[in-house]
Amino acid sequence: MAKFEIKDGVAIIPEGTGEIPNNAFFGCSSLTTVIIPESVTNIGCRAFDGCSSLTSVVIPESIKRIGSFAFYGCSSLTSVVIPKSVKIIGNNAFDGCSSLTSIVISEGVESIKGRAFFGCSSLTNIFIPKSVTSIGEAVFGGCTSLTSITVEDGNPIYDSRDNCNAIIETATNTLIKGCSSPTSITIPSSVTSIRQFAFSRCSLLTSVFIPKNVTSIGEAAFSGCDSLTSIVVEDGNPIYDSRDNCNAIIETATNTLIQGCSSPTPITIPSSVTSIGCGAFSGCYSLTSVVIPESVTSIEGHAFYGCSSLEIVHLSAGVSNLEIDSFKDCCNLKAICVPEDKVDYYKEHFPVDMHWLIVEDGSDLPVKA
């Protein structure tokens, strides 16, 4: 840091500087503007991490790599142009840049690492040039305002066929990232797989139709879609179904509910379901109550994680496997109602600070001591 200074909110980076080192301006909350000289070829890891007042940065065409977490948490940054000289955008490079409304990824960029633009909640559209041949996991996760995704024609690895507002891995027909809008999405019938977190936190999304050719859905593919009120799996799908109009995706062979909705509430879980899968209702923020039927024997980790409006849970006697974090961060829970002979059992499977919530069916709402 001795090499650089900040004057009147502007980072002073001398001509002739070859790189901006790791952590160079880490946490400099007074920094508002960065002008990088053309001698710089690399922006180091966490170079501008936590520069929460940074509103403007000009990245010259000399830069070849933007390091991991380079602009992490730069929550005042509104636009950025990635020049054609940049080959790699590092992991979490612009993660948490919540005011970022415009990103230009120039032809020449080859790799966008995992979570590079995660949580850019003001971003509305993305254009992926044909030079980009590697996109990491959850690159645009948490981009809740995203309404348009386009992959340039001629990209050898990815496409956005049928104007689907999504990024699809061409060779595998895997949908790796979708949009919040239009609110009712159309997944192309040629898609066979939906990647983990593909629609995570698409908060405007209200309905989903899963074509019969989709035979693989990654964990938390629709987590945090808190406006989602309708999920339908096309008849004839060999792996999944939405039996009994349940507004959920069920793995047919195992009777495992892998994705549910926030609404209607209370939700109705079919009596044929035997397991609530990992993260099945994670981020269903509008869900207020749930009844777990007698058929359910297993509730997996984070099944109801972060259901912040959930108040009442009815658990049956049949649950023999309950992960301790199944209802983690359900901050408004008022009662977990269980059969009389199961009170002690459930207290063994919930964290100590939730024991006061566990009451017999038919009892008054508990009061925390």
Language-model features: locations:
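Surface-exposed repetitive/solenoidal architectures
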Residues: 24-26, 282, 349-352
